[in-house]
């Protein structure tokens, strides 16, 4: 999506820090080259939003799966804070400080028939704050969930209700609460405002910019070029499984890169 109009986000100037995420010559072979990555490298730094712009189906899913630990690279390496993540898994990536806002919030972001409170702690079940020798502290979990719902303005039938009963915007705010409360070093934001109304979209963007200000590295994957231009410090275009640096913020030139027709 190249048009559409995104309200300008207040993106303050930040000095980029050290590299948080490094991909070095990684490859994943999918069903076609549009589902793959071919010896690609990138670096995302603290206090920075790295935007990945592209038309749907050009390797975004492969890139997101790699960083989430859902795929193991066939070659190359993944580093978080300079340390190689061997045979990445979702648990390893979370442990390394990666927070994930998935593309499909309803199927990848929540367990629909699980209540909201339990969805909020699903990624930290080893934390002794919420469990003791494997027994969950339900009172603590519900109190924490109520506090997070107030902080992130999650509205709906309550923390004991199944997550699937909440609206899309409130599910996304619940996911934001789960991610940001862990103070991740790296945030994978994959189509974070897709399908949201203007108010919910603005809130998501504000939270991403706050995380950037506070030192996180953010990898923003979006098909909305307006969003990428508004939020990103640097932009890479993904096309046919290849990452191409955008040397300009000119919409027309980036659009040509997205279409694979740039000179």
PLM ranges: what are they?
Residues 1-263:
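Glycine-rich phosphate-binding loops of nucleotide-dependent enzymes
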């Amino acid at each position: 999506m190249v048009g559409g109009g995104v309200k300008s986000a207040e993106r303050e100037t930040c000095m980029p820090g050290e590299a948080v995420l490094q991909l070095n010559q990684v490859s994943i072979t999918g069903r076609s080259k549009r589902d793959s990555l071919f010896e690609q490298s990138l670096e995302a730094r603290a206090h920075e939003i790295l935007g990945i712009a592209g038309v749907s189906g050009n390797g975004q899913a492969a890139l997101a799966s790699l960083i989430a630990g859902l795929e193991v690279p066939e070659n190359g390496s993944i580093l978080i804070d300079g340390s190689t993540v061997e045979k990445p898994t979702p648990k390893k990536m979370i442990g390394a400080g990666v927070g994930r806002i998935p593309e499909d919030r309803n199927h990848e972001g929540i367990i629909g028939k699980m209540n909201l409170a339990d969805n909020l702690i699903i990624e930290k079940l080893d934390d002794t704050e919420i469990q003791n020798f494997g027994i969950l502290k339900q009172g603590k979990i519900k109190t924490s969930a109520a506090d997070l719902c107030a902080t992130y303005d999650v509205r709906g039938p309550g923390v004991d209700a199944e997550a699937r009963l909440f609206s899309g915007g409130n599910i996304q705010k619940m996911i934001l609460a789960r991610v940001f409360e862990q103070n991740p070093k790296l945030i994978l934001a994959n189509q974070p405002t897709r399908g949201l109304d203007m108010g919910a979209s603005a809130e998501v963007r504000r939270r991403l910019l706050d995380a950037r200000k506070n030192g996180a590295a953010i990898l923003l994957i979006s098909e909305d070029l307006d969003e990428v231009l508004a939020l990103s410090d640097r932009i890479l275009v993904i096309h046919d499984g290849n990452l191409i640096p955008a040397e300009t913020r000119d919409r027309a030139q980036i659009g040509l890169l997205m279409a694979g027709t740039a000179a």
